[in-house]
């Protein structure tokens, strides 16, 4: 299964909508930057028909070093999760 990169998206959108690659790159970069800024400021991001980027606080917990088996503390942190929306989930499930 191939991986699609940001450059692949820029090239696809540029070709599909007959825009310059630089203009398309600016749109994609600005879109992603808005998502980043929203998450950094503590806001969840909801993209209708696609899914939600949500912030979750994980508490500290004991972990284990896989090489030595020693118990090591894992510090508390905030993580970003993605939860696909119903439409995206349904379309992906059809492709199996």
Swiss-Prot record:
InterPro entries referenced in this protein's UniProt entry, alphabetically: Hist_DNA-bd (IPR000119), Histone-like_DNA-bd_CS (IPR020816), IHF-like_DNA-bd_dom_sf (IPR010992), IHF_alpha (IPR005684)
Q: PROSITE patterns from the xrefs?
A: HISTONE_LIKE
Biological process (GO) annotations?
DNA recombination; positive regulation of metabolic process; regulation of DNA-templated transcription; regulation of translation
Which CDD domains does UniProt cross-reference here?
A: IHF_A
- Nucleotidyltransferase as a keyword of this entry, yes or no, is no
| Cellular-component GO terms for this entry | cytosol
Asked if the Swiss-Prot or TrEMBL record annotates the protein with the keyword DNA-binding, the reply is: yes
Give the record's keywords alphabetically. Answer: DNA recombination, DNA-binding, Transcription, Transcription regulation, Translation regulation
Q: Could you name the domain of life of the organism this protein comes from?
A: Bacteria
Concerning HAMAP family, the annotation shows: IHF_alpha (MF_00380)
- What task does this protein carry out? This protein is one of the two subunits of integration host factor, a specific DNA-binding protein that functions in genetic recombination as well as in transcriptional and translational control.
Similarity section: Belongs to the bacterial histone-like protein family.
Subunit info here reads:
Heterodimer of an alpha and a beta chain.
- Which PANTHER family did the record assign? DNA-BINDING PROTEIN HU (PTHR33175), INTEGRATION HOST FACTOR SUBUNIT ALPHA (PTHR33175:SF2)
- Give the protein's recorded name: Integration host factor subunit alpha
Q: Gene name on record?
A: ihfA
